[in-house]
Amino acid sequence: QPNPAKRVYIPKKNGKMRPLGIPAFADKLVQEVVRQILEAIYEPIFSDNSHGFRPNRSCHTALYQIKSTCRGTNWVIEGDITGCFDHIDHEILLKILSKKIDDGRFLELIRKFLKAGYLEFNQKYNSLSGTPQGGIISPILANIYLHEFDKFMEGISAEYTKGKQRRPYREYQILQYKRNRAKKKGNQEQADEYLRQMQNIPALDPMDKNYQRVKYVRYADDFVVCIIGSKATANEIKERIAGFMQKELHLELSREKTKITNLSDKRVRFLGYEITKSQENTKQVVDSIGRKKRSVNGTIQLVVPGDVIREKLKPFIKKGKPYQVGARVNLPVIEIISQYNAEIRGLYNYYCLATDVSTKKSTFQYYHYFSMIKTIARKEKSSVKKVIQKYGIDVPRKNGTGTMRIVGIRYNTKEGPKTMTYFNDSLKKVSRPAGEISDQFGQVLKGGQLMKRLNSDVCELCGAEHCALEIHHVRKLKDIVKKYRKRGTPMPNWVWPVSYTHLTLP
């Protein structure tokens, strides 16, 4: 019998708290085995439109699918399922599982995990519905549950697909006819004028009622439906989705948060990106057989929301200027640089698909970089200029035109001397998502300077070995200096190597 999960709360972006259920260690082991079995059964049949909690899929693959398949979209349904994970019906889920799994004991084990309940403030509560977020099997159970919705949407997409291509736009055809006549008469100037007018209107009728497409992408409980068609069609599909959710899955589609948006007028927020549609008619490219065609009209663009950059910059700005982070002053310089690098690298790695990633990240990078320099300057009671002079390292420019000076640090390792500078990689847009990330646990868990000194098992004050150690923080070097000056005794050797911040003692 599984133990009740421990309930903890983590903050959400909107200020509310998200409940998580942390299973006991023994239950985690069993859940992992169950997860692997379920993945082997269901992964081959899951929809290509589902991207959440699946191998080799991510937010990037979901966004790339929207960008590559939804060109010309008029309307977007932004789907929001009210408390999806908390309202999954156990009986419906087990019924869905029984369609593919003919093993009563295995299904009973899953039922026990679902009914195990949770502990909060040492009091047990029963689980009447939902899969607790935080459990190892919860994501795949949610995907299995919502796979029924994926199949429903694939049916909707096939049902509403009409026509092979849009009909020609009448005004465009008239101008094309006039241009051809002008060229035959030798009036090239008039023909060029007609061409300019043609470039400002669509070649195909964007409101063709006989051409319709419906595309659907889901990541966990967030989904979007991209529609080439009328608003009436979008409203009809929205009502059918709400009806299916309520009748078949006992889930509720939020009437307030589920919106229908005209992509020509307003951007859609999905997975942290903003989705918009390009309206440029004049840019042209030449295809593989030499024909000119419009390059961007109607294409889907992914952009970085402006409020994301402003929110990320809050810890590093004060009164509109770069500002130091006081909580990092006590860290060694190499760890300060490492933390700043991790922040900007993480931000870029997530938004690398955005069209404007270079512009937005350059703005972030300026304030972030000088915040790092000011943090080091405060640590060493110095100035920005002196920090750049002391830690500046000349590195080659990306375009090959000379060098540039970036703050960094040189350090020694077993493999030899190495250099760490502030993040200087290219901030260009990435056209396609990267493949599966390789196992990085070794790098994540290797620890910093403090872990190495603790693991050395030696007291830095008296040299005692093989004893329990803890880290003592030395806040201000000047206080130590005053103390030993008053005593008239020399300062011990441990003061200088520890960068004035930490000391390992029994």
Language model region names:
Residues 465-500:
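Histidine-centered nuclease catalytic patch
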Residues 459-462:
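Short cysteine-rich clusters marking metal-coordination/redox-active sites
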Residues 39-49:
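Charged boundary/loop elements
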Residues 201-212, 327-331, 443-446, 489-490:
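Active-site-adjacent structural elements in folded domains
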Residues 2-8, 48-49, 54-57, 61-253, ...:
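Conserved polymerase palm-domain catalytic core
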Residues 25-35, 43, 67:
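Duplex nucleic acid-engaging cores and interfaces of nucleic-acid transaction enzymes
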Residues 501-506:
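Conserved small/polar residues in nucleotide/adenosyl-binding loops
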Residues 228-236, 246-248, 269-457:
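Active-site and adjacent loop segments of nucleotide-processing enzymes
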